[in-house]
Design a protein with these regions (language model features):
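Carbohydrate-binding/catalytic loop surfaces
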Residues: 1-3, 37-51, 87-106, 147-168, ...
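Extracytoplasmic mature domains of secreted/periplasmic and thylakoid-lumen proteins
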Residues: 1-51, 55
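CBM-like carbohydrate-recognition segments
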Residues: 2-6, 12-19, 156, 160-161, ...
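Inter-helical turn/loop segments and adjacent helix faces that build the functional surface
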Residues: 8-12, 59-70, 114-126, 176-185
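Long, well-ordered core segments of solenoidal/helical folds
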Residues: 16-37, 66-89, 129-147, 190-207
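Oxyanion-binding "anion nests"
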Residues: 110-154
């Protein structure tokens, strides 16, 4: 939020927000200035590709300091080594191979946001872009052809259709199309189907259908399959639906 405020405010009002972005990104460096292997506090789950990578990239954009782009690339590589499965999907954490829905939506959206601000001349850009495109290509094959949804566990079609993951993946794909990273002929129909699916699961009063509850590291596939699906208001799912809406509306 404060990264967006830093970009959208006038110069005088942007300064405190930009400073917050820089301070958060600086957690990835030791007191000596040496770059850490990953961003601390949130580096054990695939969520971290979303939680940390775009923020650190934004610090690079706001300050013009290349070290932040280097850190973002290093953090992404660290997380891939930790949670990327051999088949290209992401496990949520090393505790289990389960490809949790939101645990794959986080890397998809995190990379889409990070690449939007990442310099094309950086040595890591080509790899990060290739990984984004590869992951989206794979995720597309797991979209439910009937209702346009992705599921609570990506490769378990018997798990419930999950709204927040669908919104996040749809958003990531739409961003990729808008930026010219993804082929519209291949992906726009999938985005449109996902958008209709999300619209059908968001009520006029903000009620949501089938949003997975807050989920920490779980010990087994069955734990993800049995996570509660929220019926009602949920800030997490609502935020992702709103972000998807702004992307579909092509808002700056």
């Amino acid at each position: 939020m404060f990264a967006e405020l830093a970009e959208r405010s006038d110069l005088e009002h942007a300064k405190p927000y930009a400073e917050l972005v820089r301070k958060a990104a600086d957690l990835g460096f030791a007191k000596s200035g040496e770059m850490l292997a990953s961003m601390p506090f949130h580096d054990e789950m695939s969520d971290s590709v979303f939680m940390a990578t775009p923020l650190v990239v934004k610090a690079g954009k706001l300050t013009g300091e290349r070290k932040y782009f280097d850190l973002a690339a290093r953090h992404f590589a660290f997380m891939q080594k930790l949670v990327l499965r051999d088949d290209g999907l992401y496990r949520h954490s090393p505790l289990t191979e389960a490809a949790w829905g939101r645990g794959n939506a986080f890397p998809a959206l995190g990379l889409a946001l990070a690449l939007s601000d990442f310099p094309k001349d950086h040595p890591a850009y080509a790899h990060m872009m290739a990984e984004f495109q590869r992951h989206i290509f794979l995720l597309a094959h797991f979209q439910d052809a009937e209702d346009g949804m992705w599921h609570q566990v990506i490769d378990q079609p018997g798990s419930y259709a999950e709204t927040s993951a669908t919104a996040m993946i749809g958003l990531a794909i739409e961003r990729g199309i808008r930026k010219g990273w993804l082929d519209p002929a291949m992906y726009q129909p999938r985005v449109d189907q996902a958008w209709r699916a999300v619209l059908a699961r968001v009520g006029n009063g903000g009620q949501l259908v089938d949003v997975c509850e807050s989920t920490n590291k779980q010990n087994a596939l069955e734990d993800y399959l049995h996570r509660a699906a929220i019926l009602g208001p949920d800030p997490r799912g609502g935020a992702m639906a709103m972000l998807f809406a702004t992307e579909m509306a092509d808002l700056p």
